[in-house]
Amino acid sequence: MEWSKIKNIVLLILVCVNAFLLALVLLQQHKTARFQEEASAGAVSALANSGIAFHLERVPRDMELAGLNFTQDRSGEQAAAEALLGRVTEQAESTTMRTLYAGANGSAEFFMSGEFSVALDAGVYQADPDELERAGRDCLALLGMEAELVSRETREQESVWTYRQLWEDVPVFSCQVELTWRDGSLVLLRGRRLAGSALPADTGAPLTTATVLVRFLAGLNEGNYVCSSIDGMRAGYVVSGASRSGQLTPVWRVETDTGAYDVDGVTGALVPVA
């Protein structure tokens, strides 16, 4: 047999083998997707049988977040304060846990846990009343924070805008900052920020979303919590630990008609959000 014919036969065999393997992969993916749909439907049915309506259009896809070990970097705190206040000096009352700065335009304090506050004199940082949301984001960017708006509240002559920090585009539910504006002037920032580095942590594989819903229901029963609807679910992190080193733990933030709950993405433990 000519070599060219042998070559063509070999190529045909390879094509057939690849097509067969591709068919197996597609079949497995179809089975997996069908299993996930059935599991999700079962979880939603279990919720309904317990009197809890699932108001989302569909069950969210399984979480892909991994736990992270985080180390807070405090070396940039003075620069962060000066980005808002201008020149500041560290105060003698500073300790290892709490560092104080003061300048002509206000004062700032930073804690090892990432908690901080900055008080500004009126007129130091101003914005058009119609641009406060954008101005707030710009202000937090000066502190090295990427953030999303959570809420806005008006109190007499003041308006308080609450932002949540994002870590690589993922919400950190336990890191929020309040910005208080008075007559177009930013007068106070306070909250918690992450500034440092994170490395993967060996926390185990995340639970499927269907399993999380079942664990959520079990957690409600164990804690004697009550709700009648699930109105939102979002994957993100919470910070564990209050020292310089801690962990970013993956969770599902579950919004209900009676409040929010965090469900650990690996263990399924449920914690009501204060």
Across the structure, where does each feature detected by a protein language model lie?
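Exposed beta-strand-loop-beta-strand "reactive/processing" segments of non-cytosolic proteins
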Residues: 73-107, 112-113, 143-183, 234-263
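Generic alpha-helical propensity signal that fires on short helical segments
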Residues: 37, 72, 83-88, 179-181, ...
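Residue-level detector of functional hotspots within protein domains
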Residues: 5, 54, 163-165, 172, ...
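Extracytoplasmic/luminal low-complexity segments enriched in Pro/Gly and acidic/polar residues
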Residues: 186, 192-274
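Acidic-enriched, low-complexity/disordered segments with a strong bias for Aspartate over Glutamate
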Residues: 62, 73, 121, 128-130, ...
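N-terminal start-of-chain detector that recognizes signal peptides
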Residues: 133-136, 150-152, 224-228
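Preferential activation on post-signal-peptide N-terminal prodomains/segments
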Residues: 1-147
